[in-house]
UniProtKB/Swiss-Prot annotation:
Inhibited by novobiocin. Keywords: Glycosyltransferase, NAD, NADP, Nucleotide-binding, Nucleotidyltransferase, Plasmid, Secreted, Toxin, Transferase, Virulence. In Salmonella spp. the spv gene cluster is encoded on a highly transmissible plasmid. It holds the Pfam family ADPrib_exo_Tox. Its EC number is 2.4.2.31. This is Mono(ADP-ribosyl)transferase SpvB. The lineage of its organism: Bacteria, Pseudomonadati, Pseudomonadota, Gammaproteobacteria, Enterobacterales. The gene is spvB.
Length: 591
C-alpha cells in the first residue's frame, strides 16, 4: 500500500481531484511504479514558436534539490555515468545523453573518420584546434548527431548536439555551465545546455549561477567545505530581436544581444512579498536554505545551499511598454522549511495587468487531505469527515472570476478587444451557454447573466469597515490627460465600467498610486475566502463604480513628500519610492 505524506492510497482514492486552472498542469494518480506525480507550468511567454520547454514536475520518488523534495526543473544536460562507480575522468568513463541513454562512440570509417580535428565551424574560426569525437545513443530513438569537443590548447570541453529538426544545442561551452571538481577543473562531471539556435536564427540562452557562500554560516558543518561546484539555473533569455545563424557563444562568453523575453529564477535576491512586484535586477544576496545537503556521486562534493523562491517572466519592449523590463507573470513558491527536510507547500501564479496592477494570485497546489483514521489499536484521534459545502451559482461565478475570468470580463465591459473564443468557452463551461456557436444575441444575453451573477455574488459578501484602499497604476503612457482608458470621465467624476480591484492592505509601488477614500455604505467587498486563493486581501468593486478626483499631487510638488509618508506602502517598497510620479486622491461615491 502506497503511503504518501502519511496518507494511505485507500484514503487518497476517496479524494476528488481538485480543479486546477488552465496552463499545462497535469495531476496523475499512481501508475504501475507506485509513484505519484504532478507538473506545474512555468510562466513562459510564447514567442515565434521557439521558447524554452521548461516545467516544474514532481515525483514522489524524486530526491531533494533547489525546489525541495521531489520537485525539479532540469535543463538539457550530458553527464558522466555513475551507476557503475565514481568516474575516473579518462577514456574509460561512459556518458549519459540528454535522454538518460548511455552514449557510445560512433564507428570510424574511411569516409567519416572519428575523431577529427576542427579549426572552425561554418564561417566561424577558432583561436585553437579541437578534437571532435562523435557519439550516439546505445539505443537509437532520437536520431541526433552528438559531438564531444576538447580544446587542444586549454583542454576546455563541451558538447554540440545537432537535433533531427535542425536545431543546434551547445552544452557546457563555458565554465559557468559545467559541474567540475573545484580542485581539478578538467574533471567535468556534467555539461548543461547553454545555448540553442534554430535554422531560422532564433536563439535561447541559459545563464547559471555558481555557489559563492553568501549568507551561509561558515562555522560548524560548513567549515572547510568547497562549495563552488554547484550550478543554479538563473536566467533563460530568448526572442533575439535580430536573427543570427551562428551560435553567439562561438565568439563571446556572454552574448551582448537584445532579448525580448527573460525567464528569471530567483533564489531570494529580489524579495518574495506577493504585494510587491520584484525588480528585474537582483537587489540582495541570495538566501541560504535551512536543510543544506551534498552529493558525492561524481567523486567531489556538490553542495546545495539554495532554494528557488520564485520564477519571473519579464518582457523587454521599451518603446511599446514604456520601460525596459516589464514583469508580466510570476510563480511564487512557498516552502515548509526546517533543518531536516524542505518541502514545497504552495505555489501562487500572479499575473500583472497592462497598467501594472497585480491580479489576485492563483493557488496551484492541491490542499492537503484530511488526516486518515489511525489503523488498529485504541486511538484518541477522531475519524476525519468530509464537509459538503454547497455554494450558490453567484458565488461560484465570483470565485471563477477571481481565478481567471477577470481578464475577459473586464475587457468586455470596457469595450476593449477581448478573446471572443475564450469568452465563449468560459460561458459554455459555466453553463451560461448551451452551444459553442451562439448567435450574437445569445452571447450578449449569456454575458449579461454571467456578469450579473458575479455582481450578485459580490454584493452577498459582508460589508467592511475599511475606509481607505489603494490601487497602483501606470499613467505615464498614455498621458495623464487621458486619466485611464478604461474609465469614462465626467468633469472630475470617473466611472469604472468594469469590476475594480483594489487593496485595503498595502500600496505597492507604481508610477501612480490611487489613494481611494471610502464612505459608509460603499459597495466594495473583501473577497477573502471566496477568492480563488483563500484569504487574499483584495477589495473588489462592482461595475460602474463612481469615483471623484479630489486632488492630484505630482512628484516635486510641495505636498508630495508629506502625502507619500501617509501611504501604507508595502514592506519592501521603501527603496523604490522614486518610481512614484503622482498620488491621485479619490473618493468612492455611493450614488
Amino acid at each position: 500500500m502506497l503511503i504518501l505524506n502519511g496518507f494511505s492510497s485507500a484514503t487518497l482514492a476517496l479524494i476528488t481531484p481538485p480543479f486546477l486552472p488552465k496552463g499545462g498542469k497535469a495531476l496523475s494518480q499512481s501508475g504501475p511504479d507506485g509513484l505519484a506525480s504532478i507538473t506545474l507550468p512555468l510562466p513562459i511567454s510564447a514567442e515565434r514558436g521557439f521558447a524554452p520547454a521548461l516545467a516544474l514536475p514532481y515525483s514522489s520518488g524524486g530526491g531533494n534539490g533547489p525546489f525541495g523534495v521531489g520537485w525539479s526543473c532540469a535543463t538539457m544536460s550530458i553527464a558522466r555515468r555513475t551507476s557503475h562507480g565514481v568516474p575516473q575522468y579518462n577514456d574509460s568513463d561512459e556518458f549519459l545523453g540528454p535522454d538518460g541513454e548511455v552514449l557510445v562512440q560512433t564507428l570510424s570509417t574511411g569516409d567519416a573518420p572519428n575523431p577529427v580535428t576542427c579549426f572552425a565551424y561554418g564561417d566561424v574560426s577558432f583561436p585553437q584546434s579541437y578534437t571532435v569525437t562523435r557519439y550516439q545513443p546505445r539505443t537509437e530513438s532520437s536520431f541526433y548527431r552528438l559531438e564531444y569537443w576538447v580544446g587542444n590548447s586549454n583542454g576546455d570541453d563541451f558538447w554540440l548536439l545537432h537535433d533531427s529538426n535542425g536545431i543546434l544545442h551547445l552544452l557546457g561551452k563555458t565554465a559557468a555551465a559545467r559541474l567540475s571538481d573545484p580542485q581539478a577543473a578538467s574533471h567535468t562531471a556534467q555539461w548543461l545546455v547553454e545555448e540553442s539556435v534554430t535554422p531560422a536564427g532564433e536563439h535561447i540562452y541559459y545563464s547559471y549561477l555558481a555557489e559563492n557562500g553568501d549568507n551561509v554560516d561558515l562555522n560548524g558543518n560548513e567549515a572547510g567545505r568547497d562549495r563552488s561546484a554547484m550550478r543554479y539555473l538563473s536566467k533563460v533569455q530568448y526572442g533575439n530581436a535580430t536573427p543570427a545563424a551562428d551560435l553567439y557563444l562561438w565568439t563571446s562568453a556572454t552574448p551582448a544581444v537584445q532579448w525580448l523575453f527573460t525567464l528569471v529564477f530567483d533564489y531570494g535576491e529580489r524579495g518574495v512579498d506577493p504585494q510587491v512586484p520584484p525588480a528585474f535586477t537582483a537587489q540582495n544576496s541570495w538566501l541560504a536554505r535551512q536543510d543544506p545537503f551534498s552529493l558525492y556521486n561524481y567523486g567531489f562534493e556538490i553542495r546545495l545551499l539554495r532554494l528557488c523562491r520564485q520564477v519571473l517572466m519579464f518582457h523587454h519592449f521599451p518603446d511599446e511598454l514604456g520601460e525596459a523590463d516589464t514583469l508580466v507573470s510570476r510563480l511564487l513558491l512557498e516552502y515548509d522549511e526546517n533543518p531536516i527536510r524542505t518541502q514545497l507547500c504552495a505555489a501562487r501564479t500572479l499575473a500583472y495587468e497592462g497598467d501594472g496592477y497585480r491580479r489576485a494570485p492563483v493557488n496551484n497546489m492541491m490542499p492537503p487531505p484530511p488526516p486518515p483514521p489511525m489503523m488498529g489499536g485504541n486511538s484518541s484521534r477522531p475519524k476525519s469527515k468530509w464537509a459538503i459545502v454547497e455554494e450558490s451559482k453567484q458565488i461560484q461565478a465570483l470565485r471563477y472570476y477571481s481565478a481567471q475570468g477577470y481578464s475577459v470580463i473586464n475587457k468586455y465591459l470596457r469595450g476593449d478587444d477581448y478573446p471572443e473564443t475564450q469568452a465563449k468557452e468560459t460561458l459554455l463551461s459555466r453553463d451560461y451557454l448551451s452551444t459553442n456557436e451562439p448567435s450574437d444575441e445569445e452571447f450578449k444575453n449569456a454575458m449579461s447573466v454571467y456578469i450579473n451573477d458575479i455582481a450578485e455574488g459580490l454584493s452577498s459578501l459582508p460589508e467592511t469597515d475599511h475606509r481607505v484602499v489603494y490601487r497602483g497604476l501606470k499613467l505615464d503612457k498614455p498621458a495623464l490627460s487621458d486619466v485611464l482608458k478604461e474609465y469614462t470621465t465626467i468633469v472630475n467624476i470617473i466611472i469604472d465600467k468594469a469590476f475594480m480591484s483594489t487593496s485595503p492592505d498595502k500600496a505597492w509601488i507604481n508610477d501612480t498610486i490611487l489613494n481611494i477614500y471610502l464612505e459608509k455604505g460603499h459597495k466594495g467587498r473583501i473577497l477573502g475566502d471566496v477568492a480563488h486563493f483563500k484569504g487574499e486581501a483584495e477589495m473588489l468593486f462592482p461595475p460602474n463604480t463612481k469615483l471623484k478626483i479630489e486632488s492630484i499631487v505630482n512628484c516635486g510638488s510641495q505636498d508630495f513628500a508629506s502625502q507619500l509618508s501617509k501611504l501604507r506602502l508595502s514592506d519592501d517598497a521603501t527603496a523604490d519610492t522614486n518610481r512614484i510620479k503622482r498620488i491621485i486622491n479619490m473618493r468612492v461615491l455611493n450614488s
